[in-house]
Structure formats: C-alpha cells, structure tokens
C-alpha cells in the first residue's frame, strides 16, 4: 500500500500527518485553521485518498505557519508514498466547477518542483483565512512532493467557491497522476528516471 506518515514539531507548529494514496476518500483532519480543514476534506474526498492530520500552530499570530507546514508535511508524505514512481500515469489534470467558478489543475510528478498559479481572488479573506495562503500551501506542497503544479482559476466571483474548486481539482488531478497504469512499464520517462 502506498502510504506515508510525517511528524513536524517546531516552535511554530506541531503536526502529525498520515497519507494513503490508494484510499477511499476518508478524512480525519483536525487543524487550528477551519477553512484549511474544510479544503483538505474536499481534497481528500475528491482524490479518493485517506488523510489524517492533527495540526496545532501559532494561529494567535496568523494562519501562515500552520498552513505552510501542512503543505510541507503533505508534500513529503506524498513523495515518500509514491516510492520509485514505477507504473504511475505521472500526469493528471482536472477542471472543476463550483457554481459560478471554474478551476483547472494540471500536475506532472516529474521531480521538477514548480508552481504556476493564475488566480485573482476578489476577497483578501474568507472568514479569518488569508486567501494569499492558498499559494503558500500549494507552493510548499509542490516543492516537497517535487511536482510541477499548474493552477488556473478561469473565472469566478465568490472567493470561497474559487478556492473550493481549486482543492477539488487538485484532488482529482493528483488521483489521476498517481494512478497505476498497467500499460506503463517501469519509470514513465524516456530518460529512464524522474
């Protein structure tokens, strides 16, 4: 089974995370950042992963450190769970609508970390959550998982809907990229390595 766990304890955060690629969409997520908890629930359900997170952080300052460190831990767990990446599809993409919003996520599990994000959120906050932290989370996820991640919000007027579409599309695209394809023999690259 492709799964991994991470523990991260710093002066800013205390995180325990368990991630299973071949799961059933089961989420057990407890964080001090309610909006992020909601988004990770959606990511897990729509990616058909299993994800358990217990995260505490210095949210009395703001949500930055907790959100960033969850991205770090999830990226590291994903990279470990993928192992040598033999037989995976490697690429994944998804369009997801959420009412008036439309998001697109495209992934290459290439060992070449990069985030390209095009999203113009109308609101700086959703509740108490700073919307700029979506980029921070996705960048740390891409960096630690060593994936090329492109995120485009084509349009939308409600910031919550736009971000929700991103996280659902992220789950669906990652599910596709991590899928074992019986036609793929060995590493999915003409170089023979990723």
From Swiss-Prot:
GO terms in the biological process aspect are: L-histidine biosynthetic process
Q: Would the keyword Lipoprotein turn up in this protein's UniProt record?
A: no
Query: Which terms in the GO cellular component ontology are assigned?
Result: cytoplasm
Q: Would the keyword Cytoplasm turn up in this protein's UniProt record? A: yes
Question: Origin, by domain of life?
Answer: Bacteria
- Identify the metabolic or biological route this protein is part of: Amino-acid biosynthesis; L-histidine biosynthesis; L-histidine from 5-phospho-alpha-D-ribose 1-diphosphate: step 6/9
Q: Which HAMAP family match?
A: HisB
Protein family = Belongs to the imidazoleglycerol-phosphate dehydratase family.
Q: What protein name does the entry list?
A: Imidazoleglycerol-phosphate dehydratase
Gene name, Swiss-Prot/TrEMBL: hisB
